[in-house]
Amino acid sequence: PLVSATTAISHELGRPLNGLLVRKEAKDHGTGQFVEGLGNFKPGDKVAMLEDVVTTGGSLLKACDRVRAAGLDIVAVCCILDREEGGREKLKEAGYELHSLFTRKELVEMARS
């Protein structure tokens, strides 16, 4: 939903962005690909990874691996919520800086105020 909304809004604003969907499991129907939407990109294109919630970072790292294996250059890794359960550190070890809109601590503090 995040990627679909982002690409739709970008087109409405006249600054179109293409999007990819990275699956946890390849489907046994359709294209059967882990990464959908590659036809909109060429090798070496720069992409940003967008995730709703990062916990340990494992799923996001796997998605990054699949996108890089497809020949794309990841220039940003972003999420809405970093649950602060090791994901940021794990991503940093892999060479990615995580940009989050909120951390768990920030949301808890806002809820208490």
Task: Please name every model-derived segment.
Residues 1-4, 110:
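Ordered, amphipathic secondary-structure segments that act as subunit-interaction surfaces
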